[in-house]
Amino acid sequence: MKREDGSTGRSISHEYRMHQKITTIPSPFTSFAIPQSAGFLDAEDDAAWSAILPRLPPDYTACNAIVSEKILPVKDSARRLLVQTFRPDVDAEDIMRSQSNKHCLVRPYLGRRRFYQSEMGAASTGESERQQQQQRQRRRRLLRAISLRNFPLHMDQMEQLGIDPSGYAVAMADALAVMHWVAHVDGNDVEFVLGQPRCQSDTSSSSTIPRDICSDTNTAILGPHVVWILDFDLCRDISLDEEGVGQAHHAFWGNDPYFPRPGSSNLADQRLWAIFQDRYIKSSAAALQGEPDRVKQLPGLFIELIKQARSVSSS
């Protein structure tokens, strides 16, 4: 359940409309998953809230909210691997026991690299009691700061783990094609996360279980997982013209660095951008069958705007 927080520019009823728009329009793409919507809860619906509030923390009150399918976190083995690999300075089991770190969704940042080096070295065997106490205090601060809830996984980290990101690029390209040319929304500020696939016995969804990204290698590393898309509260409708493409272009650059970027000097990043670009053009063409030629040209314009913006920022 997602409750309305009253933030400026954010509306839970608008998010519900966007969510419904994206999930109810038939789509042939199955490389990604979207949580199924279970309905909208009105703050004035006393009957519904009287049944729900007893199951929530005592400080919760009735409000506008949307109820949707829960995205299951990655397996415990994946959580442990992330901590042991990227935070060797802390006790992985302490992190694993933290209730706030149970629901680990991974954010695949295909458009950014981050070379992290731990600031903490191995403890000296000749530490004084005071040094050991300082080390324990620092460790407790680190434990409070570490969160696996929305764990950012950058390109260099995927390479370190041996993960092939090409399937994620395919899923993101398909998702953008669906949002742009099937649902006609800009995709502004949507989130992409890696989580477990929905139960195979769940036939309530019109989409099948995404399989394109679940290579044997990636599954062996993170366990069974798919790309999920969520948070549509800042999405806006677009028109099928150059103005709409411009709006989608601004949304692309305004989002977190999920998508591959053009113009990188890194060969792996170049290959990933090519995969993303080719898939987006192909999937967009499939979505726009039957549309006039002027509309069929728009996906190519979108890609060109991205390249131009990257070229300008790099010069």
What name fits each language-model region?
Residues 4-48, 167, 241:
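A conserved alpha-helical element in kinase catalytic cores
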Residues 32-165, 201-210, 217-218, 227-228, ...:
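Conserved structural core of kinase catalytic domains
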Residues 168-180:
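Short, hydrophobic/amphipathic alpha-helical packing segments
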Residues 9, 19, 23, 125, ...:
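A domain-level signal for the structural core that forms small-molecule/cofactor-binding pockets
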Residues 158, 162, 187, 249-312:
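Acidic, metal/cofactor-coordinating or nucleic-acid-engaging core segments within structured domains
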Residues 6-13, 62, 162-170, 184:
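Intrinsic disorder
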Residues 162, 181-270:
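Catalytic activation segment of kinase domains across protein kinase-like and atypical kinase folds
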Residues 32-35, 183-195, 290-297:
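Short glycine-rich, low-complexity/disordered patches
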